[in-house]
Amino acid sequence: MSNEGYDVTVFESMPKAGGWLRYGIPEYRLPKDILDKEIELMCRNGMQVETNKKLGVDFTLSQLSEDYDAVCLAVGASQAVEMNYSGSDLDGCYLGVDYLKDYVTEQNYVTAKKLP
């Protein structure tokens, strides 16, 4: 849209822009420097990115409607859905979405050594 002359502001809830391209795809599959260059190109064309901004926490849909001529919500799949199966409650068993995000950000999850 910014290529067509529209002012575009993207509100990203995470510390860096990119959504699941950044937080859900491991570095070896999608190098983050390539993603950063793509985002930088979009910003050069006029797109603005505001990070650490959560809908319903930092702003409301009503506020967006008042402040902007048009609003497009592209809410990602940031919450994992639990699947109750035998063993899913064991220590070291993580939901995939949570594990991928943690791997890229905090790296708090403990993983076991490789089994023989």
Where do the protein language model's features map onto the residues?
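Residues forming the flavin
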Residues: M1-P116
